Amino acid sequence: YTNMKFMPTGGINASNLKSYLDFPKIIACGGSWMVKGDLVAAGKFDEIEKLTREAVQSMLGFELAHVGINANSDDEAGNTASAFEKMFGFTSKEGNSSYFAGTGVEVMKTPYKGTNGHIAVSTNYIDRAVSYLEMLGYEFDMSTAKYDAKNNLKAVYFTGEVGGFAVHLVQK
């Protein structure tokens, strides 16, 4: 049964959905809490659609993770991160390819993706988010994908830009 996955449908609701989905053997969840019998009987499919969309958004938990600024050099990146530290107290921390100022601002040491920089959006389940967004017609640049030691996807950029910014997903 090591390769078996389950889809529970009983006892699931908006408040416990994530706890079910956190278990690696659960592939999906369903249940009448999204498609209530009285709504079906009344033909209120717009309300069913709304509940289902809310469930998907709750599951994926999209949040702004950070904004990336493209600098032209290590010195410029360090100075930019230091400026945020002086302004707001966002502690500057140097990494391999960037500096972070707190958790909300990343300053790249050399220009990277995005004309103006990048925006990172975090999600509870990056693999599910990629599948969902691909179904909506969005594309990912898998050459940018980053994986952890267990080969789990941790980050990936979308193709293209939004408002001059590259956008990438990151696993919470």
Tell me what each language-model feature is.
Residues E49, V105-K109, E134-K172:
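Vicinal oxygen chelate
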